[in-house]
Amino acid sequence: MVMTLLGPILPLLTIRWGLTDMQAGYLFFAQFASSCIGMLASGMLVHRYGYRLTLMFGLIVSAVGVALLARADWGFGLTAVCIFGVAFGTNTPATNLFVANTYAPKSASALSLLNSSWGIGAMACPLLIALAERQHRVPLFLYALSASLVVLAISMSAVSFRVDAEKPPALQTSGSTVNPWKHQLLLLVAVLFFVYVGSENSVGGWVASYARRISTDSSTFWTITPSFFWGALLLGRALAPFALRKTHETKLAGAGVTLAALGVSVLLTAKTMTPVVIGASLAGLGFSSVYPINVSLLSHWFGEATTRVSGAIFAVGNLGGAVLPWVVGALSTKLGSLRAGLSVPLCGALGMLIFYLVHKTKSS
């Protein structure tokens, strides 16, 4: 929920702080650029303190950032966003790699289910913000969210992580064990993560602002449009394990980014709220299986060296989450059209489709 908070709350912050789209884009940049720091530190923290303490640390830091955002001005707000960005960066690779190692034979399915639980929070966040906005209680909502994170962190102190008492097992794969930094796929995979995270967050982060400008009435329906994106993404990740029983990972990912490109295209042609909802839903469904599949394929691409390169790859991915949403805002400000800015995730989806088509051909 925390990492999708900016999307639905961004129009409110834009009004409160008097921001242009380019300035609003700096919030996304701050969030994901700071998360790179957490991602680079995540492996060291897990190695030294274990998964449980690392996750507790991330939750507490995230709670601090959310609480500070409740009453912050523009400058202090950037700081608050950076704080929970670091927390997200710490917990994301730790959680994903823990699941990938534990369920190595079926890691793509397990990661899809894991990310489905994340999607529940992402879908609920816009609905809760819309409710809080109608009651003029958005700061109270942020304080409540912060308190919930603290409670969750405290509750984890009673949970025993078996793997923390063991040496983390190497992924059982048939991948290559050569120096991963010289692997011919390393740069391409890093770019793939960069483009995916950036494209997903560009749509999820800007769709509420886009819907608000299209809306012709005084209702706050636009605030819940991200829920259609994240809800479809949640549904897709819940269904992905079933699809993966009959479909190869790269084939499913290729179909996904094709559907995402179609969804963004519908958004770009929207003049009323109905196509916005349809486009956001198609884009979310299309993007849903791509990230879990990419994570699961790391072990096939890099073998036992996956843990050595994963931190850098995750960090590059989050850099995409920082850069591409900012580019959307910058293009919108320069060209005077958020519609033009949203061409960025469309190009990203088409670029990923090319990668999967080429990789599938080489694999064959």
Put a short name on every predicted segment.
Residues A70-A80, T269-I278:
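Helix-loop junctions at membrane interfaces in 12-TM secondary transporters
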Residues P105, L113-D164:
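Helix-loop-helix hairpin linking two adjacent transmembrane segments in secondary transporters
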Residues C36-G75:
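Conserved MFS/SLC helix-loop-helix module at the cytosolic interface between two early adjacent transmembrane helices
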Residues L6-G7, Q184-S227, G231-L235:
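Extracytoplasmic gate region of multi-pass secondary transporters
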Residues T4, Q31-L40, M123, W230-A238, ...:
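Residue-level signature of mid-helix packing/kink "hotspots" within the transmembrane helices
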Residues V81-S116:
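Cytoplasmic helix-loop-helix junction between adjacent transmembrane helices
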Residues L13-T14, L45-V46, L128-H136, A211-R212, ...:
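Interfacial helix-cap and linker-helix signal at transmembrane-aqueous boundaries
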